Curated annotation (Swiss-Prot):
GO biological-process terms attached to the record: inositol metabolic process; L-histidine biosynthetic process; phosphatidylinositol phosphate biosynthetic process; signal transduction
Example of a GO MF term: inositol monophosphate 1-phosphatase activity
Metabolic or biological pathway: Amino-acid biosynthesis; L-histidine biosynthesis; L-histidine from 5-phospho-alpha-D-ribose 1-diphosphate: step 8/9
Biological source species: Chlorobaculum parvum (strain DSM 263 / NCIMB 8327)
Lineage: Bacteria, Pseudomonadati, Chlorobiota, Chlorobiia, Chlorobiales
One of the Pfam families matching this protein, by short name: Inositol_P
Name assigned to this protein: Histidinol-phosphatase
The protein's required cofactors: Mg(2+)
C-alpha cells in the first residue's frame, strides 16, 4: 500500500468516527450555504480534520474541499475532499452518507477512498491495483440488458423531469428496478455489483472525484450526460458496469450526431 492510500484510509476512518459523534443528534446544528444547500458542524469539523492530516504529511499538496477555500498545489498533486457526501441523508439520520477523499495527480484521479461509517463499509481504489470494500475485492456486474438492471439516482429531477429520449433518462422506464439510493452510496452499489447504473444529474468535483477510480478499478466506467469520460467539470455523473456503460455511451453519441 502506498503512503498516499494509507493516509487517505486513516483520515477517512478518523473523519468517519467524528461524524458518528453527530449522527442522529436532535440538536445537530444545520446552516445554509450561499447556494441554499445545507451544511452541518460535522461537515466542517470532518473536513478540517482531513485537511490538517494531509497538510501535516504533504505540506506542498493542494487541497480542494466542499466546505473551505481551495489551497493551491505547488507540485501537481491535489487532494479533493467531501467530508459528508449526502448531508441531507446525514441530517435525517439516514446512514447512506459517505466521507470521500481522492488524490488527483497532474489532472488524473490516482486514488479514491469512501467511508460509510454508519454502515461499516470502507471502499478504496488506487490506479492499477483494483477496488476493494473492507479489504475484499469488488467488481461490477455483467448485466447488459436494461430490463434486468437496477438503476439508482440521487436527485428527484431524474424522475420528475419531462419525458426525454436521452438514453440515461430512458432507463427510468426500461430498467427492471429504479430506486433512490443516491449520492456516493449509489455509485458504490455499482462498483460492488449490486446495481448496474447510478445517475447524478447535479454534480460538483468533490462529489465525483473519489467515485471515479473506485468504479473504474472495479471494472466499470464513469461519464457525463454527453457521454464524455472527462467528467470533473462535466454535465452530471453516470457510473455503470462495463456492458451497460458501453451501450449508453454509444447511444448518447448517436443521439448527439442526430441533433
Amino acid at each position: 500500500m502506498t503512503p498516499d492510500l494509507q493516509l487517505a484510509l486513516e483520515l477517512a476512518e478518523k473523519a468517519g468516527k467524528l461524524t458518528l459523534d453527530y449522527f442522529g443528534r436532535r440538536s445537530l446544528q444545520v446552516f445554509s450555504k450561499r447556494d441554499d444547500t445545507p451544511v452541518t458542524e460535522a461537515d466542517r469539523n470532518a473536513e478540517e480534520l482531513i485537511r490538517q492530516g494531509i497538510s501535516a504529511k504533504f505540506p506542498d499538496d493542494g487541497l480542494f474541499g466542499e466546505e473551505f477555500d481551495e489551497h493551491p498545489s505547488g507540485n501537481g498533486r491535489r487532494w479533493i475532499i467531501d467530508p459528508i457526501d449526502g448531508t441531507r441523508s446525514f441530517i435525517h439520520g439516514v446512514p447512506l452518507y459517505g466521507v470521500m477523499i481522492a488524490l488527483e495527480v497532474e489532472g488524473a484521479m490516482q486514488l479514491g477512498v469512501i467511508n460509510f461509517p454508519a454502515l461499516g463499509e470502507l471502499y478504496q481504489a488506487e490506479r492499477g491495483s483494483g477496488a476493494f470494500m473492507n479489504g475484499s475485492p469488488v467488481q461490477v456486474s455483467a448485466i447488459a440488458e436494461n430490463s434486468a438492471s437496477t438503476v439508482v439516482f440521487t436527485e428527484k429531477e431524474y424522475l420528475l423531469d419531462p419525458p426525454s429520449n436521452h438514453p440515461v433518462d430512458q432507463l427510468r422506464i426500461d430498467a427492471g428496478l429504479v430506486r433512490g439510493w443516491g449520492d456516493c452510496y449509489g455509485h458504490m452499489l455499482v462498483a460492488s455489483g449490486r446495481a448496474e447504473v447510478a445517475v447524478d444529474k447535479i454534480m460538483s468535483p468533490w462529489d465525483c472525484a473519489a467515485v471515479i477510480p473506485i468504479v473504474e478499478e472495479a471494472g466499470g466506467c464513469c461519464f457525463d450526460y454527453r457521454g464524455r469520460q472527462s467528467i470533473i467539470d462535466g454535465e452530471g455523473l453516470v457510473s455503470a458496469n462495463n456492458a451497460m456503460g458501453r451501450n449508453l455511451i454509444a447511444a448518447i453519441g448517436n443521439g448527439e450526431r442526430d441533433r
